[in-house]
Amino acid sequence: MIIRFKINEIECEVNEEKEDITILQACTANGIEIPRFCYHEKLTIAGNCRMCLVYVTNEEKLLAACGIPLDENFDDESIETEIDEILKAREGVMEFLLINHPLDCPICDQGGECDLQEQTLAYGLDTGRFYIKKRAVEIKTFGRLIKGIMTRCIHCTRCVRFLTEIAGVNELGVLGRGYNMEIGTYKKNVMIESELSGNIIDLCPVGALTSAVYAYKGRPWELKNIKGIDIFDTLLTPINYQVKGGEIFRILPRINDRINEEWITDKVRFHYESYKIIEKIRKETPSYKIQANKFIELTWKTALKMVFKVLLNKKNKVDLIIGSKINSTNLRIYKELMNRLGSKNYITENGLMFKKFNYDLRENYINSNDLYNVDKNDLVLLCGINLRVESPLLNIKLRNVNFGDDEIESVKKIGIIGNKFDWKHESEYIGATLNSMLKLFEGRLPYCQQIKKSKAPLIIVGPSLLTRISLTLQEMRAIFMKACNLKPENILIITQGANFGMALEEGLFKEKFSIGGNVLYSIDSNEVQVTNKINYVIYQGIINDKFENKIDLYLPSKHYFEDFEGDREVYMNTFGQRSEIEKLSISKGNKIKENSMIGYIQLMYLNNKEMTRKEKEQKDIKLSYREMKKEEKRKIKVNKYLTINNIIENYYMTDINIRLSKNLMITGQLRKEKKIMEAGIWKNRKCI
């Protein structure tokens, strides 16, 4: 329905499709600016600040534009946003908002991007009339990551609404009323337990909530934005690195409504301090272990000669494990290297959890649904996944889905198979073993009827289930489609680690791969278990905290965001969406090389050895059609009493860059010590 109306004597129109459109939204769509503090398009309407007052004909009083919906009655009415009455009202509102606000703008971290500063300049008075003593509020502790100087707070309640409505935690609220109103936790010194708590820093229009990690370190006009991605999430959330002088000062989200809207996880927002620690403790030159815990430095020429000697030794069986952060260019280089050596013992670290692969067709491993359309699903079944820690952004997408009105109120729209976890909506817990899954396939559960009646169900399969059953992603999807009568877009398979789809596209997986060689060549992979069968370990990467004592030859390489030749590189998420990242250089040492350069040197050496590709091409022939059909008809043997446990035990310990971040590590520890925090024992810890 098209609604026509007048704004400042200008005829405008807006197309009202689904939800009611407010005056504020209509004005914004037509390029007319209306100031606001409490309104945010992703949150519910509060109407606290009253900055968006407008005049509507035939109305006695000024109206808050954020809370008045447009309808067909506005055809004969006009909206005014710039008359004297409104300008005076805005001056009065600004005066009230600034009554208790401290004059500490020069030291406030919000300076330069503060909505209060900008709107005071545009709409406020040039003199103050308040001479009574200002109210001061004590600095509040919200954990290791967020700094709360609540004297600056203007009570817009954006933070409260975000945590309650989107993050699903009720740990912030409004206490008191009138002059005594405050925003805080209901108990003192309580940490906000959410994987997305840092987003309230971006939402705060003033300097009340700021980053404790970024405090007093920089100004926004000094920082340069460089495009990046959240490498710790399979969604590959777009982010901005804010850099100055080769050092990362902040990480902020980039708006993308199809993936993350405008939110990012705490893990990617605050992990950047680990890069500074890495640069201090990492080695800049290759090194070789001569005895236990004793290394000698080598030149690159000597180190690469040792690598060639190991790789070309026919007695050695080399296993190549590539980290999940490695880009597509490097994946191709090292696959080519192993093929030239006549070996197919290569895989990525996130592929080690799977027992079988099929990457003949792209649809076998890429999800055909779209995260943007998740609000159309009327039923969700979670199988072997804890969304809160494995995919927090997908978690809030689903948690805020409007499942619609149902005639039967007792029907539960969310089912969980696997470990329980906190969920906003009412859910039905089905079971934790594979036996529950088999009952679902056989139609012996009451929940099967709900799936049958559902018009748009969504089944999400996580890595915890995929690691328990020897199935390809295609076979897993086919079983759900046949058992529950679903389409491919009704099934979403979440894998672990970034660039998994790109590695499959490059064919970097092998059927029934297992680490069985005597030489391990690890490229930026820390999650490999080094067995006693392995007598020689080559580690090429940044730093290793899992099997550092077992490394025989160390080759230092650069971070993933500086490890490519041009200015940009492409990664691909679990939905097949490609994301570009820009080159960012933070490594201090000039002797540190890119993985691509090391790989090219090795290939050039092999070319000089005049190795042909005929044998490689013959070995690359895939299974014939008959063999593939025979493989598809095989019987699957599973232990039905096997429990589907979560693969992530600690959200803040999943990567070397996370483990080296002091603030994230302490945050993880404090969550475990929740009972101690409630008792007040942690009060003496440094939390700001």
Swiss-Prot record:
Q: Matching InterPro entries, A to Z?
A: 2Fe-2S_ferredoxin-like_sf, 2Fe-2S_ferredoxin-type, Mopterin_OxRdtase, Mopterin_OxRdtase_4Fe-4S_dom, NADH_UbQ_OxRdtase_75kDa_su_CS, NADH_UbQ_OxRdtase_ferredoxin, NADH_UbQ_OxRdtase_Gsu, NADH_UbQ_OxRdtase_Gsu_4Fe4S-bd
Q: Where is the 2Fe-2S ferredoxin-type domain?
A: 1-85
Pfam families documented for this protein: Fer2_4 (PF13510), Fer4_NDSU1 (PF22151), Fer4_Nqo3 (PF22117), Molybdopterin (PF00384), NADH-G_4Fe-4S_3 (PF10588)
Please state the Enzyme Commission number of this protein: 7.1.1.2
Q: How does it assemble?
A: Complex I is composed of about 45 different subunits.
Q: Which family does it belong to?
A: Belongs to the complex I 75 kDa subunit family.
Q: What is this protein called?
A: NADH-ubiquinone oxidoreductase 75 kDa subunit
Originating organism: Dictyostelium discoideum
